[in-house]
Amino acid sequence: MKIKVINPNTTLAMTKGIEHAAKSAARSDTQIVAVSPKMGPASIESYYDEYLSIPGVIEEIKKGEEEGVDAFVIACWGDPGLHAAREVTDKPVVGIAESSVYLASMLAARFSVVTVLPRIKTMLEDLVDSYGMQKRVLNIRTTPMGVLDFERDPEAGIEMLRQEGKRAVEEDNAEAILLGCAGMAEFADSLEKELGVPVIDGVVAGVKFAETIVDLGKKTSKLKTYKYPEKKEYVGALENFGRNQTTTK
């Protein structure tokens, strides 16, 4: 099978790290294609960044339809554009935050998230609430480091994750830790050994969910909510999004 992993930001070095994590998790017969959109922010650390990343994500989903892709993974812990992406393809589309919290719910009664800057705490609280996990997620723990800081200074990054992970276990009574950024994938295994609880990387979780859905032969329902968008004109910078719209399959 062919899985397209979309890093919604435009930092190619981060995409390479995501690609490595995805390929490490995937089966030997699964082809991983990791990409960044041609347009979007260098990192996603605010609502503004998130919303401006979505057109690039949708563009990559549409390209995937022509590339023979069997499933898509949106590799950002905000799951930007997830629902819109499901409208423009019948292939499975999974987000790494969604995959992480559902996997964690099968491994632990309660768990905490460790992520980047404090400003995104409310964003992620709202996100896990939308997945029905507000009673399972004990805390969204943040660090002073931005998304790209983990790429620039991995030693400082893992130390921050180690500190907040320990606090999550000792103070929150978390029984699992979720790494709340796609750029944290390389730290999961060592943190799990140190903390003594499951540590879940969303890229790995997303790839395994995508493989499973394809294996089961399931596709996105097109009955109502995720049916193809109605054809209409889009103008200005969005002009191309109105061309060749699919309404049936």
Curated annotation (Swiss-Prot):
Activity regulation (UniProt): Strongly inhibited by Cu(2+) and Zn(2+). Slightly stimulated by the addition of Mn(2+) or Co(2+), but also by metal-chelating agents such as EDTA or EGTA, indicating that the enzyme is not a metalloenzyme.
Reaction(s) catalysed (UniProt annotation): a D-5-monosubstituted hydantoin = a L-5-monosubstituted hydantoin; D-5-[2-(methylsulfanyl)ethyl]hydantoin = L-5-[2-(methysulfanyl)ethyl]hydantoin; D-5-benzylhydantoin = L-5-benzylhydantoin; D-5-isopropylhydantoin = L-5-isopropylhydantoin
Summary of pH dependence: Optimum pH is 9.5.
GO biological process per UniProt: amino acid biosynthetic process
Thermal profile of function: Optimum temperature is 45 degrees Celsius.
GO molecular function annotations of the record: amino-acid racemase activity; hydantoin racemase activity
Residues the record marks as site: Seems to be responsible for recognition and proton retrieval of D-isomers: C76
Record's keyword terms, sorted: Amino-acid biosynthesis, Isomerase, Plasmid
E.C. number: 5.1.99.5
Positions marked as site (Seems to be responsible for L-isomers recognition and racemization): C181
Quaternary data: Homohexamer.
Family note: Belongs to the HyuE racemase family.
PANTHER family reported for this sequence: PROTEIN DCG1
Function summary: Involved in the asymmetric conversion of racemic 5-substituted hydantoins to the corresponding L-amino acids. Catalyzes the racemization via enolization of D- and L-5-monosubstituted hydantoins. Is able to racemize 5-substituted hydantoins having aromatic or aliphatic substituents such as 5-(2-methylthioethyl)hydantoin, 5-isopropylhydantoin, 5-isobutylhydantoin and 5-benzylhydantoin.
Protein name, per record: Hydantoin racemase
Native organism: Pseudomonas sp. (strain NS671)
Gene: hyuE
